[in-house]
Amino acid sequence: MHITNLGLHQVSFQSGDSYKGAEETGKHKGVSVISYQRVKNGERNKGIEALNRLYLQNQTSLTGKSLLFARDKAEVFCEAIKLAGGDTSKIKAMMERLDTYKLGEVNKRHINELNKVISEEIRAQLGIKNKKELQTKIKQIFTDYLNNKNWGPVNKNISHHGKNYSFQLTPASHMKIGNKNIFVKEYNGKGICCASTRERDHIANMWLSKVVDDEGKEIFSGIRHGVISAYGLKKNSSERAVAARNKAEELVSAALYSRPELLSQALSGKTVDLKIVSTSLLTPTSLTGGEESMLKDQVSALKGLNSKRGGPTKLLIRNSDGLLKEVSVNLKVVTFNFGVNELALKMGLGWRNVDKLNDESICSLLGDNFLKNGVIGGWAAEAIEKNPPCKNDVIYLANQIKEIVNNKLQKNDNGEPYKLSQRVTLLAYTIGAVPCWNCKSGKDRTGMQDAEIKREIIRKHETGQFSQLNSKLSSEEKRLFSTILMNSGNMEIQEMNTGVPGNKVMKKLPLSSLELSYSERIGDPKIWNMVKGYSSFV
């Protein structure tokens, strides 16, 4: 299933918002209907033209989205029923009937009818007795389908101010030395989607995310992933703790992989130094689907891998021959958590459980007294001593972090939901640590952090300076951000995890005062809707 570009040729704009230079192919009251196939380059700013072309390529009605998604899922469930020796004729007949309709003739009733037929046939053909068992089976079928697809690298490119940037995303299944996956348990080219809540060996949805400039130089690198918790297993059970440990070891292996020179040294028998800054984006309260216990699993597992004074941490890594080799790592991990959703930023939930954790980690990163007197210590001071050219950037980011934390600005949106998580991640990379970030699934909040980092790192690369705190995005910066959101690789990752692209961070709530500031940060409602994509259907 691949339906990122839906191929619909007509898109409606409100009057006054049409694409200048396009030829109108029809008239409706208050609306210009424009044919994508006949769009010509107009005289408007090229950045706006590019965004409008993206809109025309991707945008479709919600009914159309839900129809395509429901129909493609129906194909998956038909295959599962066939493999079990069942009869798919009723589902096929319903699909054939829908195929005779034009898109405008289909409504939610038709889609609900298809979904109902699918549920009834799965229940009847597979001998399922109750609703809970049915829901579990439907989820299992679709999760198995997603996990048996090949997950390949995603490479995207954008141009800005005449410079080209490459976004390189490497899934865990392609973290290889030669042709061999580095991890203890093989991926065999497949993925672990975010619905794999009982997975014991692998982290769900783990990727190495790089930004490379037009000279081929890496300007940012980090690991993005789903939560280090097999939260589908019984809470506080030994098997859940073991699963978290396995996932944590895999994250450290991936972090080592992201530093090829360190990995090579480690495989040659040397003990290497590795620092990791883990930034979680969960909201740890009882109201958020168990994110409090998930965070405990993750923090406990990562801290448990920190090297003790008695010796380095031992890991098993596959070498180029595919053989497991024990490597020694002087490992230091600091763990943060900053809630970035509406519950955290609009209702103030989840902070009580992480303030102490964050304060301790800031002491490790910037020194015990930094928040009080501004004197940089900790890992940051060590980095400045080893690499003096990073000093100005470290001081700039550190002072912003100090202002945010001392004024508790991270606990409110204020036009920048990811203000602290982004700066901690950028500081980690600047001082030579491996930044890692995650939410529950590794696709929505994690994807937005990924996009915010890419926007800021391009700004820094072009201007030589990070953004000021509390500064609003200019019109040009909004266009850059929009372009990144559409071309960062996030949509492809979302599709691998759910079957369709779309970010759940984009929400319209009954009370607009509870909404995050992404309508303002993006600026263009068309792009906002494209980024939202199919997320309301998964």
Curated annotation (Swiss-Prot):
Alphabetical UniProt keywords: Hydrolase, Plasmid, Secreted, Virulence
Location in the cell: Secreted
Active-site residues, as the UniProt record annotates them: 439
Annotated consequence of substituting residue 66 to G: In plasmid pINV_F6_M1382
GO molecular-function terms, A-Z: phosphatidylinositol-4,5-bisphosphate 4-phosphatase activity
Upregulation: By growth at 37 degrees Celsius.
Resulting phenotype, residue 304 to E: In plasmid pINV_F6_M1382
Effect of residue 107 to D: In plasmid pINV_F6_M1382
GO cellular component term, pick one: extracellular region
Catalysed reaction, written as an equation: a 1,2-diacyl-sn-glycero-3-phospho-(1D-myo-inositol-4,5-bisphosphate) + H2O = a 1,2-diacyl-sn-glycero-3-phospho-(1D-myo-inositol-5-phosphate) + phosphate
Enzyme class: hydrolase
EC number of the protein: 3.1.3.78
Task of the protein: Converts phosphatidylinositol 4,5-bisphosphate (PtdIns 4,5-P2) to PtdIns 5-P. IpgD is injected by Shigella into the host cell and is required for invasion. The accumulation of PtdIns 5-P causes membrane ruffling and actin cytoskeleton rearrangements at the entry site. Acts in concert with IpaA to coordinate and control the membrane and cytoskeletal rearrangements induced early after invasion of the host cell.
Protein's name according to its UniProt entry: Inositol phosphate phosphatase IpgD
Gene for this chain: ipgD
